[in-house]
Each structure stands twice: as structure tokens, then as C-alpha cells.
Amino acid sequence: MIKLRLKRFGKKRAASYRIVAMNSRDRRDGRPLEELGYYNPMTDETNLRVEPLVKRLKEGAQPTDTVRRILEKANIFEQVRA
């Protein structure tokens, strides 16, 4: 199953995350199928690649809880339903 999840990068105690599409059995920092954006919790900054995200969600990719909240803030699910 394909999951949309966060992949950690950045410095110690100053983490940032990439939003990636990965197989659910792969480890957190393994090789992703596709990078779909990034999220910085320190500044609450997000940058999303909308078209590939919508495509992955329509194909049945399951977002984790944290990624779901980030996508809801950006109104991505409204584009999936349309």
C-alpha cells in the first residue's frame, strides 16, 4: 500500500520534513517513490506540489494523520473530490 508520510531531514533539534509517497513497509528515511512537498514545523511553512498530490490521492494513497492535517489546511481534499 502506498502511504503519504513525512520523511525527516535537517539538523538535530531543528527538524524539517519532506512529504513523500512511499510503500507502507519501507522505513521512514528510505527511498521514496516521489517527493510531494515539504513541511517545516518551526515556521509552520509548507510547500506542496498540488498536481502530483491530487494524482496520488486519486490513485488510493493513504495519508498518515499528520500529513492529513497538513493537506486539510491546504484544501487539497476539495480538489480530489472535484
From Swiss-Prot:
Provide a GO CC annotation, any one.
Answer: cytoplasm
Give the keywords, sorted.
Ribonucleoprotein, Ribosomal protein
Q: Among its keywords, does the record have Ribosomal protein?
A: yes
> Cross-referenced InterPro entries, in alphabetical order?
Ribosomal_bS16, Ribosomal_bS16_CS, Ribosomal_bS16_dom_sf
Which GO terms fall under biological process for this protein? translation
What molecular function terms (GO) are annotated for this protein? Answer: structural constituent of ribosome
Family matches, as SUPFAM superfamilies: Ribosomal protein S16 (SSF54565)
Which PROSITE patterns does the UniProt record give? RIBOSOMAL_S16 (PS00732)
Top-level taxonomic group: Bacteria
Q: A Pfam family name for this chain?
A: Ribosomal_S16
The family line of this record is: Belongs to the bacterial ribosomal protein bS16 family.
Q: What is this protein called?
A: Small ribosomal subunit protein bS16
Q: Which gene encodes it?
A: rpsP
